[in-house]
From Swiss-Prot:
<dbReference type="InterPro" id="IPR036920">
    <property type="entry name" value="Ribosomal_uL16_sf"/>
</dbReference>
<dbReference type="GO" id="GO:0005840">
    <property type="term" value="C:ribosome"/>
</dbReference>
<dbReference type="InterPro" id="IPR022981">
    <property type="entry name" value="Ribosomal_uL16_arc"/>
</dbReference>
<keyword id="KW-0689">Ribosomal protein</keyword>
<dbReference type="GO" id="GO:0006412">
    <property type="term" value="P:translation"/>
</dbReference>
<dbReference type="InterPro" id="IPR001197">
    <property type="entry name" value="Ribosomal_uL16_euk_arch"/>
</dbReference>
<comment type="similarity">
    <text>Belongs to the universal ribosomal protein uL16 family.</text>
</comment>
<dbReference type="GO" id="GO:1990904">
    <property type="term" value="C:ribonucleoprotein complex"/>
</dbReference>
<dbReference type="Pfam" id="PF00252">
    <property type="entry name" value="Ribosomal_L16"/>
</dbReference>
<dbReference type="InterPro" id="IPR016180">
    <property type="entry name" value="Ribosomal_uL16_dom"/>
</dbReference>
<keyword id="KW-0687">Ribonucleoprotein</keyword>
<dbReference type="GO" id="GO:0003735">
    <property type="term" value="F:structural constituent of ribosome"/>
</dbReference>
<protein>
    <recommendedName>
        <fullName>Large ribosomal subunit protein uL16</fullName>
    </recommendedName>
</protein>
<dbReference type="InterPro" id="IPR018255">
    <property type="entry name" value="Ribosomal_uL16_CS_euk_arc"/>
</dbReference>
<dbReference type="InterPro" id="IPR047873">
    <property type="entry name" value="Ribosomal_uL16"/>
</dbReference>
Length: 178
């Protein structure tokens, strides 16, 4: 069966389903790298993507956010060593689906609500508090607009509303005009 839309898994109720030692057949998360770029660089600004809603983000949405942010920053800044990107959320929660068929004769093949616990279909990261940080990008002053643009594009790949916050890592010097 095809993958359901992300809106089916955006909201949650109940505790997280994370005990992987008791769950057979969990697919691996699509997102594997959580840091990119140069972590030891000398940066001026930290740009953050912060959630303004509570919900779940599937692992394939996190991977889409990572790839589009990395691609945009690498293309606009010229190299992967001129920034540092860090994704802070990990998809621990296991998503289940009780597969239901909707075609002629499907009633002979499926069990309905009998044994309806569902099989694992993927994982998701839970956002349980407002204002949780999803992505941190550290850049120099000349690349600040590129980082904002990359996170704005990335926010469109997420099922939750977000905002962008810019934090200077050094005190801003005031230029004296004489």
């Amino acid at each position: 069966m095809p993958l359901r839309p992300g809106r089916c898994y955006r909201h949650f109720s109940g505790p997280a389903y994370t005990r992987k030692e008791y769950i057979p057949g969990i697919p691996q998360p699509k997102i594997t790298k959580f840091t990119s770029g140069n972590p030891n660089g000398d940066y001026d600004y930290e740009v953050r993507l912060i959630t303004t809603e509570i919900g779940q983000i599937r692992h394939n949405a996190l991977e889409a956010v990572r790839t589009i942010t990395l691609k945009t920053l690498t293309k606009r800044t010229g190299s992967e060593t001129s920034f540092f990107m860090w994704i802070l959320k990990y998809p621990h929660h296991v998503l289940r689906e009780n597969k239901m068929m909707a075609f002629a004769g499907a009633d002979r093949l499926q069990d309905g609500m009998r044994l309806s616990f569902g099989t694992p279909i993927g994982t998701a990261a839970r956002i349980e508090k407002l204002g949780e940080i999803l992505i941190v990008v550290k850049v120099k002053k000349e690349h600040l607009d590129f980082a904002k643009e990359a996170l704005k594009i990335a926010s469109k790949k997420l099922p939750l509303r977000t905002r962008i916050e810019i934090i200077p890592l050094r005190p801003i010097r005031q230029e004296v005009q004489s």
